[in-house]
C-alpha cells in the first residue's frame, strides 16, 4: 500500500513539474518588452525603446504590447501604414512632416524598373545599368511585413497653385541682412514645385546638412561666404 502511495505521489509530482514547465514556456512566449512606449503619428504606430523610434505594424505587434496599450490603439486609423503595405513600389510618398521630425532618416538609392515601371530600392544584386541610373532619396525604412521593407519619402500635400503664389511663409523673409540679400540676389528667386520639394527635404534634414557644411575651411573670403550662407539659412528656416 505504501508503495502504491509513493508511486501516486511520484506521478503527481511529475505532472505538476510538467504543468509548471508549460506555464513558464507560455509566459516567456507571451511576455511583453519592458521599457517601451507607443505613440500614434499620422496613421503610423511608432514604438520607442531605448531612445530609438521605429514604425511597427500594429496587427503583427499587438500581441507583444501591454493590454492597456493594445486597447488604446485598437480603434486607431492606420490607413497610411496600410497604404504603404499595399503599395507595390519600394518608395512610398508620405506627407507627415511630424513623422520625419520624430524618426531617424537615411539616404537610400532607388531606380525605376524598366519592365514593371515600379520604383525599387538598390540592393546588392541590382544590375550595373540600374545602379547607373539610380537616384537618392532621404527616407524612413519600415518593415511592413516579414522580410518586406518599404521606404517612406517626404512629399508634402500639393498646394493650390491656381489660387495664387506660394503662401507668404515660404517667401524669402525680409530680415535677411543687406550683404546676404545682395550676394545671393534672393529677391530674384522664383521657386517651382521641384525647388519647393528640395527645400522641404533640406529643412527636415537641416541638422545633417549643417554638420556637413560648417565650419568651412579655406580662405578668409570663403569663410565670409560661408557665414553669409549660414545667415541665409538661418533667416529662411527660423
Swiss-Prot record:
Induction of its expression: Down-regulated at low calcium levels.
Domain of life: Eukaryota
SUPFAM superfamilies: ORC1-binding domain (SSF144005)
Family note: Belongs to the helicase family. Yeast subtelomeric Y' repeat subfamily.
PANTHER family: PTHR31583, PTHR31583:SF2
InterPro entries attached to this UniProt entry: ORC1-binding_dom (IPR037240), Sir1_ORC-binding (IPR021646), Y'_ATP-dependent_helicase (IPR050978)
Pfam families: Sir1 (PF11603)
Protein name per UniProt: Putative uncharacterized protein YPR202W
UniProt feature coiled coil, ranges: none
Amino acid at each position: 500500500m505504501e508503495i502504491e502511495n509513493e508511486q501516486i505521489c511520484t506521478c503527481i509530482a511529475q505532472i505538476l513539474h510538467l504543468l509548471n514547465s508549460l506555464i513558464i514556456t507560455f509566459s516567456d512566449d507571451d511576455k511583453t518588452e519592458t521599457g517601451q512606449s507607443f505613440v500614434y503619428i499620422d496613421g503610423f504606430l511608432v514604438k520607442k525603446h531605448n531612445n530609438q523610434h521605429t514604425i511597427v505594424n500594429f496587427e503583427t505587434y499587438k500581441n507583444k504590447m501591454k493590454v492597456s496599450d493594445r486597447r488604446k490603439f485598437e480603434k486607431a486609423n492606420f490607413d497610411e501604414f496600410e497604404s504603404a503595405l499595399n503599395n507595390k513600389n519600394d518608395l512610398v510618398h508620405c506627407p507627415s512632416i511630424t513623422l520625419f521630425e520624430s524618426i531617424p532618416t537615411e539616404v537610400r538609392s532607388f531606380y525605376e524598373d524598366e519592365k514593371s515601371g515600379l520604383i525599387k530600392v538598390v540592393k546588392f544584386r541590382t544590375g550595373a545599368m540600374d545602379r547607373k541610373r539610380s537616384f537618392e532619396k532621404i527616407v524612413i525604412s519600415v518593415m511592413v511585413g516579414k522580410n518586406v521593407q518599404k521606404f517612406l519619402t517626404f512629399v508634402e500635400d500639393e498646394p493650390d497653385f491656381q489660387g495664387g503664389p506660394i503662401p507668404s511663409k515660404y517667401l524669402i523673409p525680409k530680415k535677411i541682412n543687406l550683404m546676404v540679400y545682395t550676394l545671393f540676389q534672393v529677391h530674384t528667386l522664383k521657386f517651382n514645385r521641384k525647388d519647393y520639394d528640395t527645400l522641404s527635404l533640406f529643412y527636415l534634414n537641416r541638422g545633417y546638412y549643417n554638420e556637413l557644411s560648417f565650419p568651412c575651411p579655406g580662405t578668409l573670403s570663403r569663410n565670409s561666404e560661408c557665414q553669409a550662407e549660414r545667415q541665409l539659412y538661418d533667416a529662411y528656416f527660423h
